[in-house]
């Protein structure tokens, strides 16, 4: 399949004459409709459809298990979020929600009553939605389209309990991109529970995403290679079967990404597999070893039995060690690029019996543009680029020119951050997906990564949802409209308080301009580098704390406002608390340095020295407060982790908290001891013993006596 097929798909689904009504963008009622993704064509009508005890859902095809599931899913949602009980089937009702395939006679009759011309063909995922005073019709070309129409209908329900209603309107909608995916890193720390993966599937399907990929280095519980998958931290076959069946009901294809070249250190560090490593106990499989291909064949034989579907994702990115070890001579003779592409083709040959389309990351291929022609045309390039730039054409064009299908793969920018960098993620996703659509890309895969092992997926729903909108809608995503719609679509909350908090927390990495915020959070404060940075960032630190505290206050006050996805608010609260503590830590270190140096240079002023300990708010107390705050944060982080993930790997993160707690307590004990000795010796330890570094320039210059 080539990109021309994707363009055909887009042309076929973009028939503007599918219905006799036109999109009226200027209509005030239309402008007030808040749904994500936004519909291609929407015409707001008059009146409303009241939802009550006399409302029934009717299946145009009573034998359709898929439609029955979609109907029950809608019933469960409106009961939970709007407090409305809607029944499925039963006697004829005064108000009816009719669902089914668009070609069924009963659907055709209902659309005729609603004056909707359904004579043109939709794509398989497209749907028609008509809301009248007494009848709602949700019809898809297939059961998938009907399901997506009901996801839109969920967002259209307004009011609660006896006052619940759906505003009158007509919608025709279809996706711009065939595949709309999320990749979740489950190999470098967090490994989600089965229940949480189900939450991911449900939420992604709600926003019309149709693919979820597991990024795996060593976290597949392989029966043929049981040493590799960690106990308690791997996806087991029974779990995969359960998840595949669950995802099928939500029309989400689960795609395994088992690395087949780089990123395999967790396997290659084992002595049993050491001979397969390009460099000793390294990261890259050696293409010189036949056993490398035996390992790949064994893994994918099992994965083929567990994951039905069209795709395997074989990874193949960041093979930094290639040509430095066992393949050094071959790389010297042929070039590293040639060795890479030979391996890529050999993996394809190993997996050919499974008749899957193979996805692979495109970064190495872009480094060898002259060799891109060696990529078989049936493979799919997963073209990842995370820079927030205005134009991605130069990254897309080489693969398009080679006649290769590709996914554009932006990122949620959650890696190494306390909360995702929303500014970078928004620009990356919106522009990359736009340019991918223009080039006829087969799909979009939005990526989340756990590079430092502590990222929490629950914090990343804004960029994930934004990717869903960008890939379903056509052209440049209107970010302002997306933000206007976000609180209602995601939280079922009026207003924009939650999206404002999202931008406040997501803007802190830009405000600080200090690299990754996780790294800053764990940086040793008792170093000259940290203290100099703290002084340079004093104004920004204050701004960060105000943003974090305002966000936290709003989240506390509005906790009950959200009727959907309230779990996300807990992750946002944790991020706000961590940012506030980080700012507090910076302020404490500045105060500690200033006051201790002042006391050290004025040892004869006993009142000044004693202020370090003997009054409320003294630095001695501040040091202990840091440990106390970290203890509270540690517990909050533990709870948030376990709400998403298995216990596996958690202790390695909590150990970071423990280490920093001990550091602050040790400093407070050292300060206590130093001040006690001062009473008899009139001396204090050199500030360097407390890690205070060079003397602050504003500190009085009186020499110590």
Task: Say what each PLM segment does.
Residues 2-15:
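Bacterial N-terminal signal peptides that target proteins for export
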Residues 77, 115-352, 359, 408-410, ...:
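Feature activates predominantly on carbohydrate-active enzymes
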Residues 102-104, 260-261, 318-321, 364-367:
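Short, internal active-site loops enriched in acidic
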Residues 66-68, 221-224, 264-266, 322-324, ...:
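Extracytoplasmic/secreted cell-surface and envelope-processing proteins
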Residues 29-177, 431:
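Contiguous, structured surface segment used for ligand recognition
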Residues 12-24:
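Bacterial N-terminal signal peptides
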Residues 35-38, 43-44, 122, 129, ...:
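Substrate-binding groove of N-acetylhexosamine-processing glycoside hydrolases
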